[in-house]
Each structure stands twice: as C-alpha cells, then as structure tokens.
Amino acid sequence: MSANIYIVEDEEPIITLIKYNLDKEGYKVSYSDNGNDGIKEIKKKLPDLILLDWMLPDISGVEICKNLKKDNRFKDIPIIMLTAKGEEEDKVKGLNSGADDYIT
C-alpha cells in the first residue's frame, strides 16, 4: 500500500512538478491550493505526510502547522515546509512551528 501525501501549495507549476514526481514513484497524492481547503481535506482523511507551503493566500503555512500539531490526531503526521524563505531565522520559525523538515 502506498503512502498518502497531501500538498498544500498555491503555485500551480510547483503542484504539478511535485505531484508528477510523487505519482511516478507510486504515492497517492492529493492537494489544495489554499490553506483553508487544505485543513478541511487533511481533517477528512489523515495523510501519511503533508507538504506545506509557508506563503499561502489565505492563512500562513506556519499557522496551519502550529494548529495541526496541537491536535493529537495530527501530531505524529510528518510535515515538510516548502518555501522560498531561506533565511536562518525563517527556518527556525518553520521548525519551531512543528514542521519536521524545511525545504527551500
């Protein structure tokens, strides 16, 4: 059985690239292009991994991460933060929000 990966990302080319590569490796991939829809879908069906953009149009990925990690249902789901924010201070903030890894 392949892992279910949920992507929350607002840039279509990035979604397409990530989804293409994960599909090719046999993962089941779902996604949303905004934070509020992402939260709703994640709560409906718990994924095995969340790829989360920091800068979303409606709610910060950092806020989403903090809120998910506070809930016992989601605390053990790995979250990888995807962002263009590459400063050390941003990485620390992302990891302190509960992200398991941080990719720029």
Descriptions of predicted regions:
Residues 2, 46-48, 73-78:
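His-Asp phosphorelay/catalytic-motif detector in bacterial-type signaling
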Residues 9:
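Conserved acidic carboxylate
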Residues 31-49:
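Acidic, metal-coordinating helix/loop segments flanking the phosphotransfer/catalytic sites
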